[in-house]
């Protein structure tokens, strides 16, 4: 694969055989963020679990102390007083059947997170095949199915992110922007890793954190020593 000049320059700063300390890796991720925009710093964590088994799933949500640096657009499925509560709490879109039709008929995805009250899940369930593959389906474990819509919205706007395994047993999460600086990125990193370690399934055997890699949006991967995280 052809890599651009900036990527190649950034790669020279990285020792690909070394397992870095978390703080050092985050500093390097910021140095290798050479794009003209404020790159996102991402963490990719491979776990020693088998996601094919129901008792080895790892999924949840955590509020990063310094947020992600991204403005998050929230869609809420609610009615009556709960719809009013959602509007007052700062939801970007609030509705019911009319929004479901809009998504189905117009392929509309101008939002980042979907929240629903439990009584709306019967109709929201019709969107499973549309929202599911995009990771947008409301889920109680992520706190996006809730009667307390005001808290759900506040948490999301404050920097709550969802983490879950992909098919290769890897979790991919943003932990902020390159402009955050090392202290804020380390706070967010520790918070995310702490939540994932706490969520370790009882059925998981052997080493839980197989690998931890940090990268900027356009930069190379930097390996972190997983034994320095747990």
UniProtKB/Swiss-Prot annotation:
Protein name: Large ribosomal subunit protein uL1
Subunit structure: Part of the 50S ribosomal subunit.
Keywords: Repressor, Ribonucleoprotein, Ribosomal protein, RNA-binding, rRNA-binding, Translation regulation, tRNA-binding
Pfam families assigned: Ribosomal_L1
Family note: Belongs to the universal ribosomal protein uL1 family.
Upper classification of the organism: Bacteria, Bacillati, Bacillota, Clostridia, Eubacteriales
Domain of life: Bacteria
Entry's Gene Ontology cellular component terms: large ribosomal subunit
A Gene Ontology molecular function term of the record: rRNA binding
One GO BP: translation
Function statement: Binds directly to 23S rRNA. The L1 stalk is quite mobile in the ribosome, and is involved in E site tRNA release. Protein L1 is also a translational repressor protein, it controls the translation of the L11 operon by binding to its mRNA.
């Amino acid at each position: 694969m052809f890599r651009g000049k900036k990527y190649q320059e950034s790669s020279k700063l990285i020792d690909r055989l070394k397992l870095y300390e978390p703080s050092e890796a985050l500093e390097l991720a910021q140095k290798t963020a050479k794009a003209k925009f404020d790159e996102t710093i991402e963490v990719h964590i491979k776990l020693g679990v088998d996601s094919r088994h129901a008792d080895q799933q790892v999924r949840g949500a955590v509020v990063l102390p310094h947020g992600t640096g991204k403005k998050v657009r929230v869609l809420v499925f609610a009615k009556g007083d709960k719809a009013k509560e959602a509007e007052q709490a700062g939801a970007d879109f609030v509705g019911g059947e009319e929004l479901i039709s809009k998504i189905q008929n117009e392929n509309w995805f101008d939002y980042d997170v979907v929240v629903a009250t439990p009584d709306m899940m019967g109709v929201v369930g019709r969107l499973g095949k549309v929202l599911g593959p995009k990771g947008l389906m409301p889920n109680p474990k992520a706190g996006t199915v809730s009667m307390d819509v005001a808290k759900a919205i506040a948490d999301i706007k404050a920097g709550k992110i969802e983490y879950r395994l992909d098919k290769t047993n890897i979790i991919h999460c943003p932990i902020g922007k390159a402009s955050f600086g090392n202290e804020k990125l380390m706070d967010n990193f520790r918070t995310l890793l702490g939540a994932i370690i706490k969520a370790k399934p009882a059925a998981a055997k052997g080493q839980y954190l197989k690998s931890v890699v940090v990268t900027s949006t356009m930069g190379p991967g930097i390996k972190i020593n997983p034994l320095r995280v747990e």
